[in-house]
Design a protein with these regions (language model features):
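A glycine- and small-aliphatic-rich helix-loop capping segment at beta-alpha/alpha-beta transitions
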Residues: 99-106, 175-193, 208-214, 218, ...
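Accessory alpha-helical/coil subdomains and C-terminal extensions
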Residues: 86-87, 97, 108-109, 114-120, ...
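Conserved RNA-binding domains used in RNP assembly and mRNA/RNA metabolism
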Residues: 1-76
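Short Gly/Thr/Asp-enriched flexible loops that form oxyanion-binding sites at enzyme active sites
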Residues: 163-190, 347-363
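Glycine-rich oxoanion-binding loops at beta->alpha junctions
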Residues: 124-153, 314-328
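Internal helical hairpin/lid segments
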Residues: 320-381
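Interaction/scaffold regions that mediate signaling and macromolecular assembly across diverse proteins
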Residues: 373, 382-412
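Internal gly/pro-rich beta-alpha loop/helix module
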Residues: 47-49, 196-279
């Protein structure tokens, strides 16, 4: 049994390896698992060893405890544009508490400017902390809070806002911001950027700082939004290496990869722009210009109805009529089907051996005839919906199913 010191204690750990004894110096953390010791190394990475590998644990001299004093308000360049940073969660604006190993929000202007000093020359920062949520726990009520925070930012003189967000559902919230501000044909008063990081700030490979710099630069100095692809944008790494961040349309972006730094790509279209991050500071390289004139500026965003219930189904061999009937019986406001190929559902029985297909067809037709809302998109990442290529598509029209005809792929 290893006598492991309290979290936050400076230690020198000696462990047995195949090459002999090795020493590691850092801060003790809570064990990452049973019968493990875990250390925060000086390079920011965590390392764990089984108890059986531990040869010696030496506690180093404690650093003198200094009583923290309130920090004075950081001075910012008043000539720079004002940008509000709205924190909802995620690791991009977080710090590690080395006493506990926990991650907490780092979200005062002082903390942000100290950790990412490049922001000082880009914009004046005003921080707003909406919470620290796992992105998969976000609901429509949280989209409304984000929309309200963006509206307040613009009314207080901000030229842009940056929403920091966990990456797993970042693209969905970005789409919500886009539809909230532009869903009625308008455009937001300023730039709305949603960003996050795939790697936490305590890791040497973290993308947090570059993503935040690029996002703030776009929010402060990007072009005025037109209300089309750019009502909100996603700004994250363009590739696995540093040096460039992509500016992606908030209503047409998807997370492609669970862990890569360039996990997000735009769907059926090119990025709006790229933000280069070179030694001379950030710079914007625009893509193809918009073919549309800017919409009228919206006075306020459209809020989402928080009680709306939408049932989602995947069209495959296991889609059963009773699953759909349960949603109908529960009075869901709408049903969304992720169809196959060009947007098809299992509603035909050519071999007369799958009566559930016929039941599903009749059930959906009756539901639509009674005023129910049924929308079909395609599971494929790219490509449109097209209902006139196969009989299945024309049969769906007969059922009165609604197709997302233009770019109806399974993005937000």
């Amino acid at each position: 049994m290893v006598d492991w010191p309290d979290p936050g204690t400076p230690v020198r750990l000696t462990v047995k390896t195949w090459a002999g004894l090795a020493e590691h110096t850092g801060l003790a953390l809570p064990p990452a698992g049973p019968k493990l010791v875990t250390l925060k190394l000086v390079n920011g990475y965590n390392i764990s060893f089984p108890h059986s590998y531990v040869e010696d644990v030496e506690e180093l001299d404690e650093a003198p405890m200094v009583e923290e004093e309130p920090e004075p308000e950081v001075e910012q360049d008043e000539s720079l544009p004002l940008v509000h940073l709205i924190h909802t969660g995620g690791t991009i604006a977080s710090k590690v508490d080395y006493r506990t190993g926990a991650v907490s929000a780092r979200f005062t202007p002082n903390e942000l400017l100290d950790s990412v000093p490049e922001l000082r020359g880009i914009a004046r920062i005003r921080a707003v902390n909406l919470g620290s949520m796992w992105s998969d726990d976000i609901r429509p009520r949280h989209w409304n809070r984000m929309l309200q925070a963006t509206s307040e930012a613009f009314s207080e003189g901000a030229v842009g806002v940056v929403i920091t967000h966990g990456t797993d559902t970042l693209h969905i919230s970005a789409a919500a911001m886009s539809y909230g501000w532009a869903g009625r044909g308008g455009r937001p008063p300023g730039r709305i950027v949603v960003t996050g990081s795939q790697r936490s700030p305590d890791r040497g490979s973290s993308d947090a700082a570059e993503n935040l710099i690029a996002a703030v630069h776009w929010a402060a100095h990007g072009p005025e939004p037109t209300g089309y692809r750019d009502s909100s944008v996603v700004v994250l790494h363009a590739g696995s290496s540093d040096g460039s961040c992509a500016v992606l349309p908030g209503c047409a972006t998807r997370k492609y990869h669970s862990s890569r730094r360039d996990a997000f790509k735009s769907i059926n279209q090119e990025p709006i722009a790229h933000v280069g991050l070179g030694p001379d500071g950030p710079s914007i390289e625009m893509g193809e210009p918009s073919a549309y004139d800017a919409r009228t500026e919206a006075i306020a965003p459209m809020m989402f109805e928080e009680s709306t219930k939408i049932a989602q189904f995947v069209a495959d061999a296991h889609l059963q009529p009773d699953m759909v009937q349960a949603a109908i019986d529960a009075n869901y406001d709408a049903m969304l089907f992720h169809g196959t190929g060009l947007g098809h559902l299992p509603i035909a029985d050519p071999q007369e051996d799958s009566p559930e297909n016929t039941r599903l067809r009749i059930m959906l037709a009756d539901h639509c005839a009674a005023g129910g809302v049924v929308v079909v998109v395609t599971q494929t990442i790219h490509g449109p919906i097209h209902m006139d290529v196969y009989d299945k598509g024309r049969d769906s029209r007969w059922c009165s199913l609604t197709r997302a005809e233009e770019g109806g792929h399974s993005e937000p």
